[in-house]
Amino acid sequence: MPVDLLAIAAHRDDVELTCAGTLLKAAAQGYRTGILDLTAGETGTRGSADLRAEEAARAAEILGVAERRNAGLPDAHLHNDEASRRVLVEEIRHFAPRVVILPFPVGRHPDHRIASELARDACFLAGLARYPAGGTPHRPHKILYALAYREDPVKPTFVVDISAEFERKMAAIRCYASQFDGARNAGEIFPTGQDLYSLIETQNAHYGSLIRTRYGEPFFTHETMAVDDVVALGVQSM
């Protein structure tokens, strides 16, 4: 059954770190949500692929996603090649999402950068009727980039208020004890002296402050956003 919102990321836990609150909010609004992890995280320094699979299953239950799948691509060896694109095209056709969340295409981790490019290309190719892959052709309507933990001077296109979802987001993140307990950095998150959980809260509080709420998750789109009612625009200017 198709999902309304699909989050794609390189590793189990990437989605939880960047957009778990948004997935929780969408599910509460009645939308079907899904997660596609591209790798099993088998080359990670901490934990193991099997343990991370168990942690991901527990996190998915908290997030209330309709389905979580793994593409089985090689961790630390992602490539935007024909074989990988075909795998992702079949996954996208399986989920048939309207909106897709991808990693931001700039970052220190090679897998994150390549996952973004690979998944975006696959979203286009999945709509080609004659592209040689399984499934019914489908092209997502919208691509969003999760912008959390960036140091680039990129202003979010919009920020989702996750104040009501923040505690459950943290509960999902804490499922990955093998990765985060005692850690001070992860993925795109550089160490600051805080423990990782405190640092995540600081980041989410920062983005929440930009829209005058307690916690938020930032997103970027290449397209200009349409507004139907300028009088109803949020975020106070004065």
How should each PLM-predicted stretch be described?
Residues 1-95, 232-235:
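Active-site rim/loop-helix segments in enzyme catalytic domains that contact anionic ligands
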Residues 1-6, 81-238:
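Metal-dependent de-N-acetylase/amidase catalytic core
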